[in-house]
């Protein structure tokens, strides 16, 4: 079927699937905006080239496919320079949907289906095609849906401002899309016809959006919409769609690690049960639903069996990552170890140094290593086995890139595994910090600033009083912090201020005033912050001097009371002695 042909003939498959649906709409839209010359549209001598141009534009501004047509576009642009210049012009133009139009459409989401459909038609006429249309076609709605997705963050802000339900707007948009999908099949008497590649992509885009919103119930409904019409999309070697399999594993097989409940030993109190926290609890990029559980274990094993046999599935980083998380959530760590050994030839038993390892799937990435680390910790409540396997990966795959998410998860898990009663200085977390510095130094890279990593290290510094760790963190992240502050990142700025104040407070309490001055000069970052830190330092020094003064006065007062009490005892002794 389509994905099999895509692997064998990428250019041909992409063009064939989208020529009929998007060529006319996209090129017509470009003509309306004066981007493409009329000759490009009128001459039928270049149908393939014309499609490539429209497909490239759509891919650039709104559709991020799992496959790409960059090679095809490069070839065609070399043949026709007009197309190349038109592409560049459109890319620069962008054509975003204005705020007023978005507000009008979002407000209409509370109306009935017919009124909402009219509003969507108005939006299409306003942004894409000025010709009035009573009813949008499926192709038009697909184009608009993807364009709205690129502006989803702006739409979320508008929904917040006008007190509209953001998720309901998207679900109503999908309902309209699904209605048109089925209506198309009724018109041509193809009720049982499967969804094509574009329709599957649009539906998966909506699933991704609802997962980010924490609306797993709505995401499940869209997944069922796909599976009902394409029942072989999960387990057929020819028809398997990677995005749909990934979403199936996330929604029905437990492969959403941010939802996993992890025991937090660092917050455990004597006589109380350990607190359970979620890995994504502090993450603001996604919202978590209140409940999450895996349901379909049998299909997971069938998907794993298919994935380990099909090369195109083994080469998918997202699929392997979610498959690992699914086994981890299911508690099948032995199966997980065998899968890791089968794909990357890495096992808990160390290989001899002379053995040459050849991977069968995609090269291990940071996302895959995070899934391995989290999956083993979820079952063991300990980092030992996960770190042992990761050490083998880094040793035998030296080109693996460890991004900010990897270090964030490592610090989160090491923090959760830390037991203050047994390790008062949190040496396990500090060891992870030194490991991170060594890795970046070996690659001659600067660590990227990550809010959650900074927050975890701040909590450790505050709980243990290890202010040299805080200074080391600021020193290592200083270039990245300066860049981030220039971009007005409020959250990062707030956590940096917490670092600074905590360190200044600790240094002042220890009477190291010269060290305080050096710290402010080195990590003030700008004039305003330096001024604020100097004021804070002066206040802390005043409070310290006042506290010391009160302490001395209280000591003198206690000494005076003691001496007076001693004199009274002397007088009493003299009186009693004279009586005797």
Curated annotation (Swiss-Prot):
Record localization: Mitochondrion
First-listed, main subcellular location of the protein, grouped into a coarse class: mitochondrion
GO molecular function: RNA binding
One GO BP annotation of this record: regulation of translation
Superkingdom per UniProt: Eukaryota
A family per Pfam: ATP13
Residues spanning the membrane: none
Span of the transit peptide along the chain: 1-40
Keywords: Mitochondrion, RNA-binding, Transit peptide, Translation regulation
A single Gene Ontology CC term: mitochondrion
Quaternary structure and partners: Binds to the 5'UTR of the OLI1 mRNA.
Family as reported in the entry's similarity comment: Belongs to the AEP2 family.
Reported function: Required for translation of the mitochondrial OLI1 transcript coding for the mitochondrial ATP synthase subunit 9.
Protein name: ATPase expression protein 2, mitochondrial
């Amino acid at each position: 079927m389509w994905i099999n042909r895509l692997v064998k003939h990428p250019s041909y498959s992409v063009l064939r699937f989208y020529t009929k649906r998007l060529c006319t709409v996209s090129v017509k839209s470009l003509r309306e905006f004066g981007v493409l010359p009329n000759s490009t549209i009128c001459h039928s001598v270049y149908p393939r080239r014309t499609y490539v141009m429209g497909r490239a534009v759509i891919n650039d501004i709104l559709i991020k496919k799992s496959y790409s047509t960059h090679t095809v576009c490069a070839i065609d642009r070399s043949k026709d320079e007009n197309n190349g210049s038109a592409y560049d012009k459109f890319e620069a133009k962008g054509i975003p949907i204005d705020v007023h139009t978005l507000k009008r459409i979002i407000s209409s989401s509370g109306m009935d289906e017919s009124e909402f459909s009219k509003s969507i038609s108005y939006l299409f006429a306003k942004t894409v095609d000025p010709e009035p249309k009573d009813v949008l076609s499926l192709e038009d709605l697909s184009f608009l849906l993807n364009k709205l997705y690129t502006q989803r963050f702006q739409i979320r802000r508008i929904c917040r401002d006008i007190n509209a339900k953001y998720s309901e707007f998207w679900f109503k948009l999908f309902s309209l899309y699904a209605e048109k999908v089925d209506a198309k099949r009724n018109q041509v008497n193809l009720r049982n016809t499967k969804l094509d590649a574009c329709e599957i992509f649009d539906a998966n885009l909506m699933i991704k959006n609802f997962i980010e919103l924490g609306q797993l119930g709505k995401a499940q409904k869209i997944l069922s919409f796909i599976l009902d019409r394409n029942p072989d999309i999960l387990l057929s070697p020819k028809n398997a769609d990677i995005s749909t399999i990934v979403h199936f594993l996330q929604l029905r097989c437990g492969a959403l690690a941010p939802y996993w409940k992890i025991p937090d030993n660092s917050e455990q109190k004597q006589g109380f049960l350990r607190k359970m926290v979620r890995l994504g609890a502090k993450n603001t990029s996604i919202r978590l639903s209140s409940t999450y559980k895996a349901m379909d274990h049998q299909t997971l094993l069938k998907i794993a069996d298919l994935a380990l046999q099909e090369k195109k599935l083994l080469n998918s980083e997202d699929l392997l990552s979610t498959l690992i998380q699914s086994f981890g959530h299911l508690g099948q760590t032995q199966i997980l170890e065998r899968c890791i050994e089968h794909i990357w030839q890495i096992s808990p038993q160390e290989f001899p140094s002379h053995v040459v390892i050849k991977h069968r799937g995609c090269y291990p990435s940071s996302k895959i290593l995070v899934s391995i680390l989290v999956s083993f910790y979820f079952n063991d409540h300990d980092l030992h086995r996960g770190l042992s396997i990761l050490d083998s990966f880094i040793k035998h795959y030296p080109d693996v890139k460890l991004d900010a998410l990897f270090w964030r998860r490592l610090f989160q898990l090491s923090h959760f595994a830390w037991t203050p009663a047994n390790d008062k200085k949190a040496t396990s977390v500090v060891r992870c910090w030194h490991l991170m510095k060594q890795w970046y130094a070996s690659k001659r890279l600067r660590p990227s600033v990550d809010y959650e990593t900074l927050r975890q290290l701040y909590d450790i510094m505050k709980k243990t009083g290890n202010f040299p760790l805080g200074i080391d963190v600021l020193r290592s992240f200083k270039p990245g912090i300066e860049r981030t502050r220039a971009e007005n990142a409020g959250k990062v700025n707030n956590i940096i201020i917490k670092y600074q104040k905590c360190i200044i407070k600790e240094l002042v309490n220890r009477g190291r005033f010269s060290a305080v001055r050096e710290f402010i000069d080195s990590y003030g970052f700008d004039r305003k912050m330096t001024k604020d830190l100097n004021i804070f330092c002066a206040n802390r020094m005043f409070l310290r001097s006042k506290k010391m003064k009160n302490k001395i006065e209280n000591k003198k007062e206690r000494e005076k009371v003691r001496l007076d009490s001693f004199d009274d005892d002397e007088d009493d002794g003299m009186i009693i002695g004279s009586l005797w």
